[in-house]
């Protein structure tokens, strides 16, 4: 008889909150990421950050730069750099499509969130994005404040 598998508890998705504020998101896609075992364990504990990270295409491969993964505390074999470059796993066709859009329109690749899918594999949601100007950021803040005030008025009545 087979044993019942215990449901694994994973950390909630790790979000890059600043990305939606600083960029206009045009298109999103999900990519796999190449990690070492100790890095996966560290991400499961929630010791990762996407702040100030970005993706770039180099020699036909997509690389994630500046993603911080704190080294796993029980790993004694090797010490890894916390902000090393990590390869994103996409099809050649998807990479080619991204590369043409980045080159012709001046867009950037920004990671939005890191999450574990239902099979327990770490995935990164990346987006083609265009940087916002300062007045766009101010407009976003104003619209958020107006929305918040509306919600407060709805609660009182």
From Swiss-Prot:
Keyword Cell cycle among UniProt keywords: no
Database matches in Pfam families: SmpB
GO molecular function: RNA binding
Protein family: Belongs to the SmpB family.
GO cellular component, one term: cytosol
Membrane-spanning ranges: none
NCBIfam families associated with the record: PRK05422.1, smpB
Organism: Chlorobium phaeobacteroides (strain DSM 266 / SMG 266 / 2430)
Subcellular location: Cytoplasm
PROSITE patterns referenced in this protein's UniProt entry, alphabetically: SSRP
SUPFAM superfamilies xref list: Small protein B (SmpB)
GO biological process: trans-translation
Keyword annotations: Cytoplasm, RNA-binding
Top-level taxon of origin: Bacteria
InterPro entries referenced in this protein's UniProt entry, alphabetically: SmpB, SsrA-bd_prot, SsrA-bd_prot_CS
Principal location class: cytoplasm
Keyword field contains Magnesium: no
Summary of the function given for this chain in its UniProt record: Required for rescue of stalled ribosomes mediated by trans-translation. Binds to transfer-messenger RNA (tmRNA), required for stable association of tmRNA with ribosomes. tmRNA and SmpB together mimic tRNA shape, replacing the anticodon stem-loop with SmpB. tmRNA is encoded by the ssrA gene; the 2 termini fold to resemble tRNA(Ala) and it encodes a 'tag peptide', a short internal open reading frame. During trans-translation Ala-aminoacylated tmRNA acts like a tRNA, entering the A-site of stalled ribosomes, displacing the stalled mRNA.
Listed name of the protein: SsrA-binding protein
């Amino acid at each position: 008889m087979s044993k019942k598998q215990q449901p694994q508890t994973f950390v909630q998705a790790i979000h890059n909150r600043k990305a939606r504020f600083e960029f206009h998101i045009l298109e999103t896609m999900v990519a796999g990421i190449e990690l070492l075992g100790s890095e996966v364990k560290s991400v499961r504990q929630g010791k990762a950050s996407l702040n100030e990270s970005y993706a770039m295409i180099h020699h036909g491969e997509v690389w994630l730069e500046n993603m911080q993964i704190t080294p796993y505390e029980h790993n004694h074999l090797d010490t890894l750099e916390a902000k090393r470059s990590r390869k994103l796993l996409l099809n050649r066709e998807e990479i080619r499509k991204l590369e043409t859009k980045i080159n012709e329109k001046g867009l950037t690749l920004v990671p939005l969130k890191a999450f574990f899918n239902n099979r327990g594999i770490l995935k990164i949601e990346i987006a083609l994005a265009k940087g916002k100007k300062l007045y766009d950021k101010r407009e976003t803040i104003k619209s958020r404040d107006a929305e918040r005030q509306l919600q407060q008025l709805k609660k009182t009545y």
